[in-house]
Amino acid sequence: KFEINAWAVYMHNSAIGMANPEAAVTNVFGNKFLSELCPINPAVAGYAIGLTKDLVSRGINAITAESLHFHGARHGEHHERFFIELSPVTEFLFSLCFCPHCIKNYQDGGSDIAPLLSKVKNSLSIVFEKVDPWLGKRLTKELLAEIIGPDILTYLTYRENKIASVYKNISKVTKAAGVIFKYVDQSPLIDMNSAKAIESSWQIGIDTKQINEIIDCFEPLIYRQDVTAVADLAKNYLEGTDAGITAILRPTYPDSTSPKNLINKVS
């Protein structure tokens, strides 16, 4: 008897985004990222629950959940072009969702969204009208707070908590059906030169500590060519989480240069 795993891609769905633009991530200028659904939107969260219920009803052993988070400015359909050099800070601010539901999520915590919207918009206007002042600087929460103010950190915390609640609701469905809940973690792709992927997960709205308490298994995308880089990332997850871990490697170019290279990474 075969054990069947369902690989579900949740928030990266252009067909739904184009048919329902109100469900798409919407930045501070009102630009819609139609390839990306906003997980804060209750209708989108409901869709994620419905998709999960449908899959667990089919006698599967596990759900491998991909794209259950935000993605960033460059993910898109992989055809997007900016034609100017943008820092990681600018890309991050440009991709932040301020759809009505993200605004409500922030204001439900007792905060006024207007100052935050103004600061983000003004900061990005400097880039587009003059030059990106953050080129060469690493994206950190500390730098964001310096640029925008502490409100940005509150915003990020609120969205992490809301996304964690979506995971909790999905987990209730999988547990009731006796289905394993696996999370495809794209954090290693945020900074291809970093061995500490977990420290970058906040950039896509994921609080690893919260998710660690909900899911059954992390499946990080460890797309690296060097054997040591693979080992370092695996160590990062082994030390930073206590859920199960199944690394996803890419057996083709450019990650694997030879059969021996792949064998060494697996072993």
Where are these regions (language model features)?
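Active-site-adjacent "subsite" loops/lids of carbohydrate-active enzymes
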Residues: 5-58, 75, 83, 92-101
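Aromatic- and acid-rich polysaccharide-binding/catalytic face
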Residues: 132-151, 199-229
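Short acidic, glycine/proline-enriched helix-loop-strand junctions
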Residues: 71-118, 247
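Active-site groove signature of glycoside hydrolases
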Residues: 26-33, 37-40, 48-77, 134, ...
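The substrate-binding groove and active-site-proximal loops of carbohydrate-active enzymes
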Residues: 1, 31-46, 150-162, 218-224, ...
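Aromatic-lined carbohydrate-recognition surfaces of secreted/lumenal glycan-active proteins
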Residues: 3-11, 64-68, 102-131, 154-200, ...
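Generic structural signal for well-ordered alpha-helices
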Residues: 1, 52-53, 163-172, 208, ...
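Substrate-binding cleft of secreted/luminal carbohydrate-active enzymes
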Residues: 60, 208-233, 241-267
